[in-house]
Amino acid sequence: MKNNNDIKFIYEKLSSLYPNYSNKKPKAKIYSKAYTSLIGVMLSAQSQDKRTAVACRQLFALADSPEDMINLSQEEIIEAIRPAGLFNAKSKNILATSKMLLEEFDGRVPNTQKELMSLPGVGRKSSDIVMRFVFGEPHIAVDTHVFRMLWRLGWADS
């Protein structure tokens, strides 16, 4: 691990490069509802942004709530989300998550990381994204690329 002086140096450099950066809670949501934000994040896993956007548009035209989603067949969901890839696993997770939201969370997206990660298809990174951009909590989504950079800087252990 590097010492605090190294971290402070990097922070000051980045702050000078990005003077308008704000650490305030974000106001905008990814989509208009927490549910569609959650499903959008689930669809984004291992997918390009363009393909995720197409899949979201197609899926949310059919269903944009857990109540509506569980009325779709897995095949209907697969056809809608096909552009995002991994459509078999994602469709199963979307249906299972929608059912779980209705059965265990009164149809609402939970606002704790532990509860989010109990949903099928939601891991640490996805839950961090939802916590940050849906609920405005100070979470940072760390993917393999961010972790690799932090490891090379000596700020993270393998």
Where would I find each of the regions flagged by the language model?
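Catalytic cores of DNA base-excision repair glycosylases
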Residues: 2-158
